[in-house]
Structures are given as structure tokens and as C-alpha cells.
């Protein structure tokens, strides 16, 4: 016998977004359903932060990350390579560790975690300050979908620039609200 639904799907037309939404849409319009995406975003970034802390050696002791780590630890100031000034923002947390006299493993752990915290901060600014859920979701999806390709190549400034771009785009779209 073939499978039959006990009730046919009831689709409603939503003129706001021009989408056909399933019959359960009214149930999704509750206070809890509005908090779930926010919670999911923060949970995902918390997991990414925990992963960055757990895999700090794999993330910081290879290739460019090790080279840049050596330079900012030895100099005690941000290591700006090839005019990539965005790298200074993620080197501030490990530099605080250097200035406080923390061990090498602690400084490298802070460096590994600071990359994820940068993206989490961009996500939080879009979500909570600018009230732009779409930009926040874009940052979240960008980080989750590219984590397989970029998780261990952490100091790629392009990824930081794209997260920052979402924040700046969100600010640009709201420029008339502030005038």
C-alpha cells in the first residue's frame, strides 16, 4: 500500500514575502520561535570556540599562523604582514596574554580562539545592535559552511573581511534610520 497523509498539506500565501508557507506557520510566530535562531547562532559559535580551543595546536602551529605568531610574540605588538591591517584585530587577545606574561601555549590558545570570537562579535553586532537577522544569519552560515575549508587555516584575512563586510553592509542599509 502507498503512504497517504492523514491531512493534506494546507499552504497559505504570505503576501509579505511572496512565499507559500506550510500550514504550521501560525505556530512558528511565537516568542520562543523568534529566540530559537538567536540561540542556535550563539550555540554554534560556542561550539566553534570550543573546537578552536581544543584544536589550538593544529590551528596555530602550522604555516602562516606559526610565522605570524612568532612575530607578534617576539615583538610584543601586532604583526602586520603585506599591509593586512585586519590581522591586528584578532591578534589583540593573544597580545594581552603576551603582555601579561602568559605561557606560549596560553598565548597560542588565545590566538586560536580570537579568530572565532571575531566572527562571533560580528554576528552579535548584526543580530543585537543592528537588529539585522539576515546579516547575522549570513555570517553564521558563512562560518559554518566554510569551516571545513578554513578551520585550520585560521588567519585568512579574507574570511575576517567578509564577516566585517556583512556588518558594514548592515550599517549601510540602516544609514537613513540614524539621520
Where are these regions (language model features)?
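Extracytoplasmic catalytic/substrate-binding loops of multi-pass membrane glycan-assembly enzymes
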Residues: 53-71, 80-93
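Loop-to-helix entry region of an early transmembrane alpha helix in multi-pass inner-membrane enzymes
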Residues: 100-120
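Transmembrane-helix signature of polytopic, membrane-embedded enzymes
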Residues: 126-146
Amino acid at each position: 500500500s502507498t503512504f497517504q497523509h492523514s491531512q493534506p498539506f494546507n499552504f497559505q500565501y504570505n503576501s509579505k514575502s511572496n512565499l507559500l508557507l506550510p500550514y504550521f506557520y501560525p505556530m512558528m510566530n511565537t516568542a520562543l520561535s523568534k529566540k530559537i535562531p538567536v540561540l542556535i547562532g550563539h550555540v554554534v559559535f560556542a561550539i566553534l570556540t570550543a573546537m578552536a580551543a581544543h584544536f589550538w595546536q593544529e590551528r596555530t602551529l602550522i604555516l602562516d599562523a606559526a610565522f605570524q605568531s612568532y612575530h607578534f610574540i617576539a615583538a610584543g605588538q601586532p604583526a602586520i604582514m603585506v599591509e593586512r591591517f585586519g590581522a591586528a584585530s584578532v591578534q589583540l587577545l593573544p597580545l594581552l596574554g603576551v603582555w601579561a606574561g602568559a605561557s606560549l601555549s596560553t598565548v597560542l590558545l588565545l590566538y586560536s580562539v580570537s579568530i572565532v570570537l571575531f566572527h562571533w562579535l560580528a554576528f552579535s553586532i548584526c543580530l543585537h545592535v543592528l537588529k539585522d537577522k539576515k546579516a547575522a544569519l549570513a555570517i553564521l552560515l558563512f562560518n559554518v559552511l566554510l569551516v571545513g575549508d578554513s578551520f585550520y587555516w585560521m588567519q585568512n584575512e579574507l574570511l575576517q573581511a567578509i564577516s566585517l563586510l556583512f556588518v558594514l553592509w548592515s550599517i549601510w542599509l540602516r544609514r537613513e534610520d540614524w539621520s
